Amino acid sequence: MSVHIELPRELRPLMKKPLGTLYRGKGRDTIEKFAGELGSPTKLISVGDVTTFHLLEVGIIPDICIVDNRTKRKPVSSDVSARNMDKVYSEVSVDNPAGIITDELIKTLCEAFASEKPIRIFVRGEEDLATLPVILLAPLDAVVLYGQPDEGVVFVKVTEEKKGEIRTLFEKLISKNQNYELDKLRRILDGHKNS
């Protein structure tokens, strides 16, 4: 049985607010604005096709990239799709519908974080909400990068404080009274290995 967390309509405006520092601009220029701040993160994760494409174009290889071959709900160009299939990556595919975070996505993210090899997670559906579990599951001092449509790239440094912010958001999504399966997802997202 598949379990999922759905983002209620009333919380969707929260997702339009950047979860970190927004670097305004387009393409390579935007990446160059924050490239010097990357340092040596414990893990570098990119969420989104266009962000991943521009990182790879400037020679920055994320440890984990999460893509769906779409941008703003339309197919990406063949150039973007081809570049994002860089041979350095092992690929895993998951189903994850729009507006939802599935248990399959969360389990795949856990496996990707445990891997020493670069992983490309191809999402059949939509990857937009993946940023939330990525921040919770990432090690401290990781960096998460994702696109903010028509504005630029959001740079999130994973800290205890940032994890706390995202945990608070998840508590709104998963009430304490929900079923055992959702409780298992909550424990995984809180960093517990027992599932």
UniProtKB/Swiss-Prot annotation:
A single GO molecular function term of this UniProt record: kinase activity
Official protein name in the record: GTP-dependent dephospho-CoA kinase
Q: Top enzyme class of this protein?
A: transferase
Annotated signal peptide: none
The role this protein plays is: Catalyzes the GTP-dependent phosphorylation of the 3'-hydroxyl group of dephosphocoenzyme A to form coenzyme A (CoA).
UniProt KW keywords: Coenzyme A biosynthesis, GTP-binding, Kinase, Nucleotide-binding, Transferase
Question: Which Enzyme Commission numbers does its entry carry?
Answer: 2.7.1.237
Q: Which GO terms describe its biological process?
A: coenzyme A biosynthetic process
Do the record's keywords include Acyltransferase? no
Family in the record: Belongs to the GTP-dependent DPCK family.
Question: Record's InterPro entries?
Answer: GTP-dep_dephospho-CoA_kin
Write out the residues that bind GTP.
Answer: D49, V50, D68, E127, D150
Q: Which PANTHER family match?
A: GTP-DEPENDENT DEPHOSPHO-COA KINASE, UPF0218 PROTEIN TK1697
According to UniProt, this protein's pathway is:
Cofactor biosynthesis; coenzyme A biosynthesis
What HAMAP family is this protein classified in?
A: Dephospho_CoA_kinase_GTP_dep
Report which reactions are catalysed by this protein.
3'-dephospho-CoA + GTP = GDP + CoA + H(+)
